[in-house]
Every structure is written in C-alpha cells, then in structure tokens.
Regions:
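Short linear, low-complexity motifs centered on an aromatic residue
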Residues: 74-89, 109, 208-210, 215-217, ...
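Active-site proximal loops enriched in glycine and acidic residues that flank catalytic Cys/His/Asp
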Residues: 45, 69, 97, 275, ...
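Gly-rich Lys/Arg/Thr-decorated short loops/hinges at beta-loop-alpha junctions or inter-strand turns
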Residues: 2-15, 34-36, 224-233
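Active-site core of metal-dependent hydrolases
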Residues: 9-120
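Glycine-rich, acidic/polar active-site loops that bind/position phosphate-bearing ligands
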Residues: 121-307, 316-319, 326-564
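C-terminal amphipathic alpha-helical interaction region
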Residues: 501-699
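Active-site-proximal loop/turn and secondary-structure-junction residues that shape catalytic pockets
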Residues: 45-49, 69-71, 99-100, 147, ...
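N-terminal flexible segment immediately upstream of the FAD-binding catalytic core
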Residues: 1-26, 140-141, 264-273
Length: 699
C-alpha cells in the first residue's frame, strides 16, 4: 500500500471536503442545504457542481460518467457516456452539464416493472441523489441516482428507501419536539451491514455449472470434515484469503467505504466483512459496492466469491445482519438506553415504537428477506427461524415488565467482570447478552435484524423498518401532541404501559431454534411464513397497502408491481436451478457414472481372464449399487422434466411459485440425494465437477 490509510480513504470520492475546496462558497452552501434539508437544487447550482465534479474526475483519469442506480433486479445498473464532445473542426472538448448531472434517461422497458410499464413504454428517468457522494470506478464517474418511469412510478430500490427515511425522520422529529428537543431538525436511520461470503478456487468454480448458473451447488456429498470442530470461526486467515482481504480493503477505502472488521466465519471457506455505521441510503449504496468489489477482487486472486445464501448443503449458509439505529442531526443515538434505561423516557418511547412496529408488521419484515436462496437458510439451526420475534435481553425485559406491572424497577447497576487471574483486566459487563437465534435483537444501542440473506439489497428491509416505525411514532405523536408537564408525563406512562402490554407477544429472549418456541409462537399468534410463496401475498394485504400509502413510501400500484416482480423472480430462480440440474445430470453426471461402471466391468472381466476362478465380488457389488442408483436418478430425472414442463405452462406466478416450492424443489432434493450417494462411490478423476473437499478446503 503506497499511501497511508487516511490518504487512501475516500480518494476516489467527490466528498464534502472536495466540494468545499472546489466549489464557490455560495454554491457549496446551496448544495449543503439540499443535502442536509432536502431543499430544491437550482440548475445554476447543478451546473457549477457538474463542472467541478468533471474536473475532479478528469484529474483521476475518468473518461466517462454514468447514472448509477439500483433497479428491481437487486443489483446495480449503469450506462456509460463519455465526457467527449466534438467541436466540429476535428477536435473535441470534455463537457458535463448540470442537466446531465441531475437527470438521465435510460430505457425503462428492459428492467423489471411488475406491470407498471409496457415494453413499448421505454422512457425512464434517473435523478441524482446528492446525499450519496459520486465516486470513480475504473475510468467512470458514478453518480448515485434514483430510477423512475416516465409517469413517475418508482422502478428501483433507492426511491422508496429515501421516502421511508423522510417518513421516519418526520415522525421521530415530531416526537422529540413534543419532548422538548426543538433543536432537532432531522432524524437519520443509520445502518451497519455485516456481509458474509464464501471464497472458492476459480478453476473449481468454472467446472461447476450449478455455481455458474445458480450460484449454489445442486449436488455434493459432504466432505469428511465440515464445521463440527468449530475451528474455522475466528481462526487464522489463510495467506491467499488474507491477500484478497488486503486488496479488498484498499479498494473499499478508496471508495470511502469504512470497512472495519474481517474474520473467518463458522463454515469452511466462509468469511465476513463489517463496516462502520452510515446513514442508511449510503450504507445500502456501499453494500452494493462491497458485493461488486468482492467479486472483482476475488477474480484477480484466482478466486470466486459466492454470495448465495446457501451455496453448500450441510454447512452454514451466509447472511447479512442489518444493524439499525436512529440518530438525530445533533448527534444523539435515540436507541442508547443510557446508564438507567428505566428512567430514560425518550429511549423507552423509541423502544416501544420499535416493539409495536415489529409486532404489527412482522409479516412485512419476513417478506423483506423472502428469496429462493434465503428460504434454504431460515429456520435451519444456522439462522433465525421464519417466525419474527424480538430479543431485548434480561435487563430491558425486566424494565418492560416493571412498566407493565407498575412495579418499581431496581437496576443492578454496572457489574464488573473478573475472569480470575490478576494479570487480566477487569471490565464492565454489558447489560444484554447476544442471542444469535433471534431474528430481531437489541444489542446495546441498536437493533440487529439477522434474517436478511447475503445477496440481498438491504433497501427492502430498511424500507419496512423505517415505515413501520414511522407509523408507530405517528400514533404516539397523536396521543401526546399538545400535552405538557404532568399531563404529558402521565400520558407517556400510560402509552408505554399499553404498548408493551399489547405487544408483549413479540418479545422472546429464549432459543429460537427449538420446536418448543415454534409451538409457543403459534400459541401467541405470531405468523410463521415458511417460504417465499407463502409470505409474498401478505405484501398486498390491506393493512400493508394502507401503511405504505399513508406515509407516501409506495403507492398501491408500486406495491403490486413489487409483489409481481418478487413472485416472478422466485419462480424463475427455481426454474433455472431445475433446468441446470437436468443438464448436469443428463450430460455430465450419468455419463461419468456409466464410464466408471464400464471400466469396473472391464476390470472384472480382465481379472477373470488373467486368473480363472478369481472372485470379482467387490466389482460386482459396486456395479450393482451404481447401476441401481443410475436407474433411480434416470427415473427421477424423467419425473423432474415432466414437472418443469407443467410449471412452464403456468401463467400465474403465485401458482407457479407454489408449485416450484412444494413439488419441484422436493423432487430436486430426491435427485440430489441419489447423486450424492453415487458420488461417494466414484473416483474423483471420473467425476465431471470438483467435490466439496476441493471447493471448501483447497485454498
């Protein structure tokens, strides 16, 4: 690394310090006002910003610019335009206008719209999000933007997120003003995204069609060793992986992404990266860049980065923990309980709002993480169950119980930890333990939403959280508005008691992996939406439509479009997996099996010719076993082909998605098990693809 980290950090970002240095004072102030308060950006300001941004980009080797946006595909999109502008006399100049900065016009017809746009209705618009800084990637200036249709409907992940940020800020600020904090002008959602991923050798990756097409293995007998020794988690990082991590950090730091923590995860070949908290729209943008850079840097190290939620059967899959908090523009974390949480009225109000929101909109939180990949992970004793519950920890649950019962809470105070040997330091014990089985856990000064899958855009979960909490806060403001003094105190006390009493069912501090909890959750009336097709219809329930439209986050039409897009994506994902399985079995695995059986038969015949009367029992036993498995695989493959044909004839995506989940996935599992049984009997040099041994342990 030629530069120090402070010199490197943000060097490819047109950030606040660059703007301050390059823009005239009046222009900088106008832009800062837009960024901080959301005021309208005048064209003359945009023109000045565009000129400064272009000059900065050219100095860093950029030749093109792009409006970088996040359509409903869940990944980013970009179209590159050069700064070049011919003069008409055989020469060219480099130009970039305020209009080009503020607005773009990509073709909207080729992106998912869920029926909002017909194919012939091609015009769409991208609009600059000045709260997320422009950056340089390669030779291209990337300008973060929102994406909408010609008629103004949101066609992306960013627009509803920005709307939800405004909604929760409005209601949280209102509540703080009621409490007397009138200096607060804005409340920001902050997020830290813990990104899990796998690294495998690139050559092994290229030999697996399932990894290429499906991002997960469709077959694979378990390696002799998995994760049962607990020796990979936080273990020593292998040199090849360490080199990848070092370069990844450098690339992320250049882009102003505050990558902080890196370590081995539980499963072999699994790792994690975690950044410092940022404002949610910036955190979501940065997480998209993190995933992109992971793949690019891995490729340069002859590795492949797998972001699927369950790339390997029999070991842990990958998630993306969404650490969520609320902070004021004056620098206060509203989820910080302080030293005496029982006496912290402000904290208790915001805690109650989150508890109510999670209970009332648990179905939406489940939907926000519903994908074909994540269905393999949730509820599998490696990730939270599909039932949404909320963990508070021992002390906070006791505080809540005291409010409900109106019994004075006597805190234990700070507890000093002493491990034993005098040489080891004493330190203060945290108020809450960590519950890794909880979908939604309070972890000291934030909530950790643990259900999102590793490949997911975090826009969806945070849109739900922001909007649901905004609804709770709006209800609180309605009750408390206009009250002062003792009247306000009494109203707050009653509000807290009623809220914690009415929503007590969502609070659970125990082991979420047990069958006993699932039975208890059912008794409490908590939804258990086990699969994506089961969950998605709840998105368009009347109460949820009302929530989004009331807070101007999504229109009814935009909500229905997302319902259609998510269903279609689910069905198409399983369809691709089924077709890939069909091809791998038909063209690759069965021919390899037949080749080995043929060689076994030849070996047996040769032995008998060379040594008359010699036994060939071992060969015959293996041939019989493999031939039986081949028949099973072939028969089941015929069944799968018929099922695929049936699904292809369905024009209702909910019906198709349900069929893929209930019928086709079950048949694919039958084939997987038969192939795995055969795989362990066949030498590796006959197999058409690398085994789990090579994929997980040969880096």
């Amino acid at each position: 690394m030629s530069k120090s980290i402070p010199e490197l950090y943000g060097s490819l970002v047109f950030n606040d310090s660059e703007m301050k240095a390059r823009l005239p004072k009046d222009i900088y102030k106008a832009l800062a006002k837009t960024i901080n308060s959301g005021s309208h950006l005048e064209l003359d300001v945009a023109n000045s910003v565009a000129v400064a941004m272009k000059e900065w980009a050219l100095e860093h080797g950029a030749t093109h610019f792009t409006h970088w946006f996040q359509p409903m595909t869940g990944i980013t999109a970009e179209k590159h335009d050069s700064f070049l502008s011919p003069t008409g006399v055989g020469e060219a100049i480099m130009e970039f206008s305020g209009k080009e900065l503020v607005k773009g016009e990509p073709d909207a017809s080729s992106f998912p719209s869920g029926g909002l746009r017909a194919t012939f209705e091609a015009r769409g618009y991208t609009a600059w999000d000045p709260t997320s800084f422009a950056f340089i990637k390669g030779h291209t200036l990337c300008i973060p933007t929102a994406f909408c249709s010609y008629s103004g409907e949101a066609l992306d992940k960013k627009t509803p997120l920005l709307r939800s940020m405004e909604a929760v800020s409005k209601e949280a600020t209102h509540l703080l003003h009621i409490l007397g904090k009138t200096d607060v002008k804005r409340v920001n959602t902050t997020v830290g995204a813990e990104q899990e991923y796998f690294l495998v050798d690139k050559e092994c990756y290229r030999l697996r069609k399932d990894l290429i097409f499906c991002r997960r293995t469709l077959f694979g007998a378990p390696a002799p060793k998995g994760q049962e020794m607990d020796d990979h988690y936080f273990g020593s990082i292998k040199p090849r992986v360490e080199a990848f991590m070092e370069e990844l950090n450098e690339e992320l730091w250049k882009l102003g992404i505050p990558a902080k923590t890196e370590h081995n995860e539980v499963a072999p070949a699994q790792h994690e990266l975690a950044p410092v908290f940022e404002t949610v729209n910036v955190a979501v943008d940065h997480n998209q860049l993190v995933m992109e850079m992971m793949k690019k840097v891995a490729d340069r190290h002859d590795l492949a980065c797998l972001l699927h939620e369950k790339p390997f059967e029999g070991i842990n899959g990958s998630g993306k923990h969404n650490n969520w908090a609320l902070s004021t523009d004056t620098g206060e974390n509203l989820l910080n309980p302080g030293k005496t949480p029982a006496e912290n009225t402000q904290f208790l109000l915001f805690l109650a709002a989150v508890v109510e929101a999670v209970d009332d909109y648990a179905d939406l939180l489940r939907i926000s993480v519903a994908t074909a990949g994540n269905d393999h992970r949730l509820g599998a004793n490696e990730a939270p169950p599909a039932v949404v519950s909320l963990f508070l920890g021992e002390e906070l649950e006791a505080v809540v119980d005291s409010i409900k019962s109106e019994i004075y809470f006597e805190g234990k105070g700070a507890v000093q930890m002493s491990i034993g040997p005098k040489v080891l330091p004493h330190f203060t014990k945290d108020n809450t333990d960590r519950n890794r089985t909880s979908p939604f856990a309070f972890t000291g000064n934030k909530f950790e939403f643990r259900m999102p899958g590793s490949s997911l855009s975090l826009s969806g979960p945070n849109v739900i959280l922001n909007t649901a909490v905004a609804e709770s806060l709006a209800g609180f403001c309605k009750v408390l508005d206009g009250l002062t003094g003792s009247e306000l105190d009494l109203a707050i006390h009653k509000l807290l008691k009623d809220t914690f009493t009415d929503h007590a069912r969502i609070i659970f501090n125990g082991n979420g992996y047990t069958d006993e909890w699932l039975a208890e959750a059912k008794k409490r009336g908590l939804p258990n939406l086990k699969s994506t097709p089961e969950a998605l219809p709840h998105l368009i329930a009347e109460k949820n439509i009302e929530l989004f439209t009331k807070h101007h986050v999504l229109t009814k039409e935009e909500l229905f479009s997302r319902y259609e897009i998510l269903l279609e994506d689910y069905a198409k994902t399983i369809h691709i997996e089924a077709k890939t399985m069909e091809e791998m079995v038909q063209k690759d695995f069965l021919p390899s099996l037949f080749s080995y059986v043929n060689d076994l038969a030849c070996t047996g015949s040769t032995k008998k010719e060379l040594v008359p009367g010699i036994t060939t029992k071992a060969e015959e036993k293996l041939i019989t076993k493999l031939s039986g498995l081949a028949d099973t695989i072939s028969d089941e493959l015929d069944i799968l082909k018929d099922m695929i044909g049936t699904a292809e004839g369905m024009d209702d995506y909910l019906k198709a998605g349900t069929y893929y989940h209930d019928t086709i996935l079950a048949e694919m599992e039958t084939i997987r098990l038969a192939v795995n049984d055969a795989e362990v009997l066949i030498p590796e040099d006959y197999l058409p693809y690398p085994t789990y041994d090579a994929l997980l342990f040969y880096i």
